[in-house]
Amino acid sequence: MAKDKSRSKEQVTREYTIHLSKRLHKTSFKKCAPKAVKEIRKFASKVMGTSDVRLDVKLNKAVWSKGIKNVPTRLRIVISRRRNDDEDAKEEMYSFVTVAEDQSTKGKGTVVVQDA
């Protein structure tokens, strides 16, 4: 059964909880925060179907907030698939990842955010 490719062309914003400690298991201490950034990129690329992933400065500060060794266990992130305005861009869509305002994760799954 083939997936419908036309769905990946629409703009959408979703809110996810990413479990970083699960993704950083058996990583040496001095590589935890850089690997966490790479894992967030990989996660966003997978769920949104775009290879162009851009991270917000606030997200980077949230990952590095407790230093290089002690990254947050879970992080609530907002991923937006947006249209690329560059004429010479390889892809027509890109993903923009930022940190969610509400960091509580209890009872929250994936939420589609309605743009106002």
Swiss-Prot record:
Q: Which InterPro entries match?
A: Ribosomal_eL31, Ribosomal_eL31_CS, Ribosomal_eL31_dom_sf
Which Pfam families does this one have? Answer: Ribosomal_L31e
Keyword Transmembrane helix applies: no
Q: Which GO terms describe its biological process?
A: translation
Q: Which GO terms describe its cellular component?
A: ribonucleoprotein complex; ribosome
UniProt KW Transport keyword: no
Q: What are the record keywords, sorted?
A: Ribonucleoprotein, Ribosomal protein
Q: Which SMART domains match?
A: Ribosomal_L31e
GO molecular function per UniProt: structural constituent of ribosome
Q: What family name appears in the similarity comment?
A: Belongs to the eukaryotic ribosomal protein eL31 family.
This protein's name: Large ribosomal subunit protein eL31
The record lists the organism as Chlamydomonas reinhardtii (Chlamydomonas smithii)
Q: Name the lineage.
A: Eukaryota, Viridiplantae, Chlorophyta, core chlorophytes, Chlorophyceae
